[in-house]
């Protein structure tokens, strides 16, 4: 059963015992919602000390459930949405209407929990939501979200009725899709035409009609009396390449192709509706792409995309400060003193160079600890970074806590995120293994409970 909990609690300084807290939470499972109130102890787990003898396994204190969870900060998420909205609607710009924000909640909300994140963002003022598929859109709609939902990767044949039934706005990326959508829309009891958005392929060569096919599209649309074009979009291939480069030039060319095609569409008498092309990177660095609506993805969750160290990127981060939304946590479930020359983990890929204290964490790659972090990454323990050693297992991870005085069994460990005054950001963790932040965030698996805290 996949569980999500909505809760709040009071933080206490490290080392202080906290009273048991009465908290209400909501569990989401298989589309059903069950409200519960439960007393959950916030006291520190029983203390244990490292084994005195090399090789002796220390006793694990009794804990309720498997100690791995992801804390999702509703206040940080709200902060990021408001920061983005203000950023793309500068006070000195003269616009009749403010730019809209379409919050991307695909991929289970970048691992944060799509339906729950969408509810928080709707309350915070998001205008639209973006999902990958009709099934994702239905989950968000069933969570009670009322704002428009755009299905970004279009739809499969046979899904048209679900789109209409759940009031989901599809993206059309092939002219042939219009006829099937129009047939289903003609059966609706509503007299208003069914709205869709058109995707143009301006250089990514993935999805979308070519700008040279605009005339064909306009001709096909004229035959579909039950459809209405509600918006036009494209997607950038390299907008995170801030510094002058081949990739930066590609983005400029994509912008040019898009706006030329848009003017052709208008010349053919077709109102494009809401124009949108700015993704996270373009929001941060390319104001000329903001148009009528922007589509923040990873920046909603607290991170600027890519890892280009250019001055332009640094300036974007200064102008648009974000707060990390998710912290992935676990606990130390075992401590072991090992001598120098001891192999640790599968294949003994890590061999100690000195007498060491090895901690075992109750989380592995089956939870979202990237397997590539073995021997390359670190975790946050008591405000210090402890290296991950050996190969990351499916269910556990080993760390070297020799340099973390007083580390105990039951100790809370932050894989990435925020722990009090200390931060171990996911983008730095991603950079250490040569991947992108979204890869880490989306890897948090279904068996990890999400705790929505304020």
State where each predicted segment sits.
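A structural signal for short, hydrophobic beta-strand segments that form beta-sheets
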Residues: 151, 229, 332, 388-389
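Residue-level signal for inorganic ion chemistry
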Residues: 77, 140, 232, 332, ...
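Flexible, glycine/charged-enriched surface loops at secondary-structure junctions
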Residues: 94-98, 271-274, 423-430
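Hydrophobic faces of well-ordered beta-strands that scaffold small-molecule active sites
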Residues: 70, 101-105, 129-131, 149-151, ...
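A charged N-terminal "starter" segment
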Residues: 4-12, 22-169, 439, 449-454
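Active-site loop/helix belt of alpha/beta enzymes
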Residues: 43, 63-66, 107-124, 142, ...
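C-terminal accessory subdomain/extension
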Residues: 21, 35-37, 42, 47-50, ...
């Amino acid at each position: 059963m996949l569980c999500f909990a909505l809760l709040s609690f009071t933080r206490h300084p490290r080392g202080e015992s906290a009273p048991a807290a009465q908290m209400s939470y909501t569990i989401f499972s298989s589309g059903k919602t069950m409200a519960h109130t439960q007393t959950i102890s916030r006291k520190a787990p029983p203390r244990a000390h490292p084994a005195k003898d090399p090789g002796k396994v220390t006793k694990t204190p009794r804990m309720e459930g498997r100690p791995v969870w992801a804390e999702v900060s509703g206040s940080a998420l709200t902060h990021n949405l408001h920061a983005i909205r203000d950023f793309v609607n500068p006070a000195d710009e003269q616009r009749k209407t403010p730019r809209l924000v379409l919050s991307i909640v695909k991929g289970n909300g970048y691992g944060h929990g799509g339906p729950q994140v969408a509810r928080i963002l709707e309350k915070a003022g998001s205008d639209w939501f973006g999902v990958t598929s009709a099934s994702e859109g239905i989950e968000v709609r069933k969570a009670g979200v009322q704002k428009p939902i755009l299905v970004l990767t279009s739809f499969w044949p046979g899904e048209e009725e679900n789109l209409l039934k759940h009031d989901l706005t599809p993206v059309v990326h092939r002219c042939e899709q219009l006829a099937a959508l129009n047939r289903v829309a003609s059966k609706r009891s509503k007299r208003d035409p069914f709205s869709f958005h058109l995707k143009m392929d301006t250089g990514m060569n993935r999805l979308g009609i070519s700008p040279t096919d605009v005339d064909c599209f306009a001709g096909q649309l004229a035959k579909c009396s039950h459809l209405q074009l509600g918006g036009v979009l494209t997607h950038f291939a390299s907008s995170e390449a801030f510094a002058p480069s081949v990739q930066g030039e590609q983005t400029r060319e994509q912008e040019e192709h898009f706006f030329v095609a848009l003017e052709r569409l208008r010349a053919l008498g077709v109102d494009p509706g809401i124009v949108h092309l700015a993704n996270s990177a373009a929001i941060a660095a390319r104001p000329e792409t903001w148009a009528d609506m922007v589509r923040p993805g990873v920046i909603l969750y607290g991170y600027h995309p890519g890892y280009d160290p250019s001055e332009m990127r640094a300036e974007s981060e200064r102008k648009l400060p974000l707060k990390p939304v998710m912290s992935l946590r676990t606990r130390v479930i075992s401590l072991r003193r090992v001598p120098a020359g001891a192999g640790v983990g599968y294949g003994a890929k890590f061999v100690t160079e000195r007498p060491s204290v090895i901690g075992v964490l109750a989380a592995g790659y089956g939870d979202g600890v990237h397997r590539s972090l073995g021997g390359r990454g670190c975790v946050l323990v008591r405000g210090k970074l402890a290296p991950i050693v050996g190969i990351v297992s499916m269910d556990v991870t080993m760390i070297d806590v020799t340099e973390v005085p007083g580390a105990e069994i039951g100790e809370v460990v932050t894989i990435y995120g925020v722990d009090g005054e200390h931060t171990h950001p996911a983008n730095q963790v991603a950079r250490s293994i040569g991947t992108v932040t979204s890869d880490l965030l989306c890897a948090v698996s279904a068996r990890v409970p999400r705790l929505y805290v304020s």
